[in-house]
């Protein structure tokens, strides 16, 4: 999965043409990877919520919100054309903001979810880490917007995949150190679909950030061996790995 990320080190898009150019760069990058490596590359495309928040001061809340929604609509056009497969990252700022901004962020996300639901499109969420409360609030927004909860994929999720914690939302878990213990203690047959992620940036200024690309194979092996030690049957472990790395991603990152 190649996820569109704004370049905060350069100027952020201030109009729809700017977003069109930024999206095109990500899509071109995906084409290059396919051509050079022969790998399948799915693109997650959309305006980042942090960009929206950063642009409130220079553009004003109304203009920043209008631009964000236009950028969502543009991303959905690319998705409909088959150039991308998921809307994201969308969501809320993951850091403290004032009450007006926070309320506006939730209202904006509700509208974005409604747009995705209308297109039968999954979304990848960039949200704050406030434990089960974050999941519960996201689930409530999904229900209001008519977006199935398992079509909202929480990015950089904590290693708790119990249904009581996730409230039925899908998740890609950041598989850093200590994550396997959390997964082993919370995974059940009732868990919503989830996967593993590194949030790898390929940024020369932050080498290896957030986690290196070899992390997922390493954690997969660690998860398998730990589950077997915990008494899981080999077939059950194999089926779970097939779900994590094939079935669930194929289902989550698709157009229904």
Where are these regions (language model features)?
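Conserved short secondary-structure transition element at the edge of the structured enzyme core
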Residues: 188-203, 254
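Gly/Ser/Thr-rich loops at beta-strand to alpha-helix junctions
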Residues: 129-132
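Short hydrophobic/aromatic-enriched beta-strand-loop microsegments
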Residues: 149-152, 169-177, 194-196
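Conserved phosphoryl-transfer catalytic core
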Residues: 229
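Short, structured coil segments at secondary-structure junctions
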Residues: 166-169, 190
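Active-site proximal loops enriched in glycine and acidic residues that flank catalytic Cys/His/Asp
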Residues: 127, 156-157, 173-175, 198
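Mid-domain alpha/beta scaffold segments of enzyme catalytic cores
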Residues: 1-119, 125, 136-145, 158-160, ...
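Class I S-adenosyl-L-methionine
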Residues: 153-166
């Amino acid at each position: 999965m190649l996820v569109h990320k704004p370049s905060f080190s350069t100027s952020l898009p201030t109009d729809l043409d700017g977003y069109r150019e930024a999206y095109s760069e990500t899509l071109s990058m995906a084409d290059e990877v396919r051509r050079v490596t022969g790998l399948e590359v799915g693109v997650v495309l959309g305006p980042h919520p942090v960009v929206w928040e950063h642009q409130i001061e220079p553009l004003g809340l109304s203009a920043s919100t209008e631009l964000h929604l236009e950028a969502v609509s543009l991303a959905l056009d690319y998705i409909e054309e088959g150039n991308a497969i998921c809307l994201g990252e969308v969501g809320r700022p993951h850091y403290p903001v004032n009450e007006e901004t926070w309320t506006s962020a939730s209202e904006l996300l509700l509208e974005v979810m409604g747009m995705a639901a209308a297109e039968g499109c999954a979304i990848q969420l960039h949200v704050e880490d406030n434990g089960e409360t974050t999941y519960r609030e996201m689930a409530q927004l999904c229900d209001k917007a008519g977006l199935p909860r398992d079509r909202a994929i929480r990015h950089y999720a904590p290693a708790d995949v119990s249904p009581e914690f996730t409230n039925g939302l899908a998740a890609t878990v950041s598989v850093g150190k200590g994550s396997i213990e959390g997964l082993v203690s919370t995974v059940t047959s009732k868990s919503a679909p989830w996967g593993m992620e590194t949030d790898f940036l390929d940024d020369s200024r932050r080498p290896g950030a957030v986690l290196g690309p070899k992390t997922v194979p390493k954690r997969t092996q660690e998860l398998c061996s730990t589950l077997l030690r915990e008494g899981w049957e080999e077939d059950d472990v194999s089926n779970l790995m097939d779900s994590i790395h094939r079935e669930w991603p194929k289902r989550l990152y698709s157009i229904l």
